[in-house]
């Protein structure tokens, strides 16, 4: 017996997809313009997870550009005859593609692009039928003309795995459970007891989000909806309920025949979401040929008790991320924007430190700044880092950033102002930079501390074991999805820049920790 605590993956791990091989489960999530892309997790008990890598871990697999909410949308992972398949959409470049691996920890292949004309739309998934044939299921705009925003349909077509090409006719099989519903998306196909089941989300990935299901005896036929659709949602629970935006789900069974659903949902704080959309778990039973989610409860629960043996990992995903830099390979939890390249960081130039190189790219612009972040996982947290940095010119800076997107983030930086060194607290809100507080410092050898709770933050520096308050009660609501828009949650990370000019300077970090308090 094991108990999982929801969300099972905290922080912005949206659009979860899961598969099982034996008693091992593998789960993937969207990554947008963060790189490396598509984090992959392993679990045996659906309660405790380890990250075994990032599927798109090299630039040749992951051409990215544009807004932070572009890039990789809604991956699906499946296993068939010893081969793992991950299919997803890169909305920045190339559209829908597949990568494969014999080991889910990698290496994964180069992308097989399906063609933006041949495979239009987003949210692709794969289904392997009993005869071994593989089928693509995805979403696309109404081919007869989009009548309203979100007027899309779900379609299916055979996929030739030898050529990695779609073959034969394509057919629309569903448009969503409710009349004129918007954004039928995240489709997945399953086969059970002689029926093909189509699970999907609809109504958009916000408060009205919902999960519906349809079925058919034949794959190439219009599906019939469950009479109880939508089968799962939180939109009926009101805006003060602690979990909202529930949708985009995937089903999996265990070796004992028990069924589960993973799905995304959000946990707002003071009515706003800085964590993005997280991964939750629910039990599923089948009644009268249809799935019932969390029977007798009908909503997500804080705990999920399962008849599986507990299995723990030495490097388990928790709400404490403590990074020290004795290793020569960067931790998989760190992500960059567009690229995570040794062009701008090193773990060997100064052993025991992470060195970030100052480059012209600035974090308030789209592009690839010298930034390495990890996901914010809780509303009440403490983030801190130790750094050694001496800016040579007024344009140089380094420190720590709470990042929502290019136009909305909180900069905590060591800077030079004429002949003085300063620590600067600088919110960036809707593209406007604000100098909220500064503190003169004698050197750039210090610790930066951010303590947050209830959408407010206090900022400290620590020098010679003295903790100094620099700014207090900073409003963090500008860094929420409701204020900033987009599809991502916050990351917190290390940052260095020469702001438009070339530089040979760098910042060395001794540690970086983000932990729940």
Swiss-Prot record:
Substrates-to-products reaction catalysed: Hydrolysis of (1->4)-beta-D-xylans, to remove successive D-xylose residues from the non-reducing termini; Hydrolysis of terminal non-reducing alpha-L-arabinofuranoside residues in alpha-L-arabinosides
InterPro entries: ConA-like_dom_sf (IPR013320), GH43_C2 (IPR041542), Glyco_hydro_43 (IPR006710), Glyco_hydro_beta-prop_sf (IPR023296), Glycosyl_Hydrlase_43 (IPR051795)
Positions marked as site (Important for catalytic activity, responsible for pKa modulation of the active site Glu and correct orientation of both the proton donor and substrate): 123
GO MF term (any one): xylan 1,4-beta-xylosidase activity
EC numbers on record: 3.2.1.37, 3.2.1.55
UniProt-listed CDD domains: GH43_XynB-like (cd18617)
Cross-referenced Pfam families: GH43_C2, Glyco_hydro_43
Catalytic machinery residues: 15 (proton acceptor), 185 (proton donor)
Similarity field: Belongs to the glycosyl hydrolase 43 family.
Protein function: Has a 1.6-fold higher activity as an arabinosidase than as a beta-xylosidase when tested on the substrates nitrophenyl-beta-D-xylopyranoside and P-nitrophenyl-alpha-L-arabinofuranoside.
Protein's UniProt name: Xylosidase/arabinosidase
Gene transcribed to yield this protein: xylB
